[in-house]
Regions:
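ATP-dependent adenylation/nucleotidyltransferase module used to activate substrates
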Residues: 1-144
Length: 144
């Protein structure tokens, strides 16, 4: 497939999210949906799995999620039959904290290395291993 005219696609499908999902999955490209299992994430997970329940759902579980997040992840995974692929840091939380202490504060110079280890490396590994050509996410304008 050559060039995709996204302006034309957006003009045709507009804000019809289910139609956009159908169109994107209809391209026949390797697809993933990423999630952090915030409450509103269920919407995009539901939309994508309604079109193709086999799409890999990639979750970077940094080991620092709340009990509510883990319960929500389990509930949504079961209800939607998600093809969940969990990516964890290479070093477990208990090991990291035993050697380096608790999570460094945002203004602590060690925080950059912490972020690289528990968030960025698992994310980069997930993208390498899944090699998506179509990527769904519920990123909001207020997210960073």
């Amino acid at each position: 497939m050559g060039h995709i005219d996204l302006t034309a696609v957006n003009a045709d499908l507009g804000r019809n999210a289910p139609a956009l999902v159908q169109w994107a999955l209809g391209l026949g490209k390797t697809s993933i949906v990423t999630t952090n299992f915030r409450p509103f994430e269920a919407v995009i997970l539901h939309m994508v799995t309604q079109v193709n329940p086999k799409v890999p759902v990639v979750w970077m579980d940094n080991g620092y999620n709340t009990e509510a997040t883990y319960r929500f992840a389990d509930e949504v995974t079961k209800q939607l039959g998600l093809n969940l692929k969990i990516y964890l840091p290479l070093r477990p939380r208990a090991h990291r904290e035993a050697v380096e202490g608790p999570t460094p504060a945002l203004n602590d110079p060690r925080h950059a290395a912490f972020t690289a280890e528990v968030k960025l490396e698992p994310f980069a590994r997930a993208l390498r291993e899944t090699a998506p050509e179509v990527w769904f996410t519920a990123l909001r304008a207020t997210d960073t």
